[in-house]
A protein has these predicted regions:
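P-loop NTPase motor module signature
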Residues: 1-246
Length: 246
């Protein structure tokens, strides 16, 4: 089941997470998955939880003290060995602090409870500034539902959203497709290399903004990756369109 925060949804995120952790630990045994927008949020929350847990915190997943809790971070910049910690056996409760890599990319085993502040870093390209950014934004309803679905796979679970039901209902149903919000330079270059023809004529499920296509072609032309902005590239004798060696 998913619960939403009431009038205190604007309170400090870390405080809200700690309060939710206390509530879920009182609800029964089981591991907790907390979704956070980025590495810094994870590190700040990890430090706060370790301080809050005090002597109950253990670093190796072994229940040497009553009510022992392990806190495990999970984000893409961690080494493969560090990311693999979430799959290792443990004998105490575990709190996993993860980016949205745990939303769809992998399944963290043993999760019974989820805490969702409702935020994520969403890649966006600005047609005005020509810069790719990673702003923190509210997730869509579909993403929120996906997150809530990560709990209760081993037993009846609880998902706590740190935002109101009205906030949830006001969010877009789905996350905007990536092709509509990121730089198309790499897509255009790959299409040219594969000889797929003009980008403007390709039958995308979600056709990109013509301005984004022009920006991508202009960038690739300026750095010499393709030859002609008119059709994306000049075809060589081998039928390939992009410059570059093997």
């Amino acid at each position: 089941s998913a619960e939403s925060a009431g009038p205190q949804e604007d309170r400090d995120q870390v405080t809200g997470i700690i309060d939710a952790v206390n509530e879920l630990m009182a609800a029964g045994p089981g591991d907790i998955l907390v979704f956070l927008p980025g590495e810094r949020d994870i590190r700040d929350t990890e430090a706060a939880l370790v301080d809050h847990l005090g002597p109950r915190h253990v670093a190796d997943g072994r229940a040497r003290v009553p009510g022992a809790v392990e806190v495990v971070p999970l984000y893409s910049r961690l080494s493969a060995a560090e990311q693999h910690r979430v799959f290792e056996a443990h004998s105490c409760r575990r709190i996993v602090l993860a980016t949205n890599v745990a939303e769809t990319s992998l399944t963290v085993p043993g999760i019974r409870y989820v805490i969702d502040p409702g935020l994520a870093r969403i890649s966006r390209y600005s047609n005005r500034t020509k810069v790719q950014r990673l702003p923190i934004e509210p997730v869509s309803r579909a993403s929120a539902d996906q997150r809530a679905g990560r709990c209760g796979r081993v037993a009846d679970g609880i998902a706590i959203r740190l935002y109101s039901e009205a906030d949830y209902l006001a969010r877009p149903e789905y996350t905007e497709p990536e092709i509509l919000r990121t730089s198309l330079a790499s897509v255009i270059l790959q299409m040219a290399a594969l000889g797929l023809g003009a980008v403007e004529d390709f039958p995308f499920l979600d056709p990109p903004d013509p301005r984004a296509v022009r920006d991508g072609i202009t960038l690739l032309t300026e750095i010499g990756a393709i030859d002609r902005p008119s059709d994306g590239a000049r075809r060589g004798p081998n039928g390939r369109s992009a410059r570059g060696g093997r």
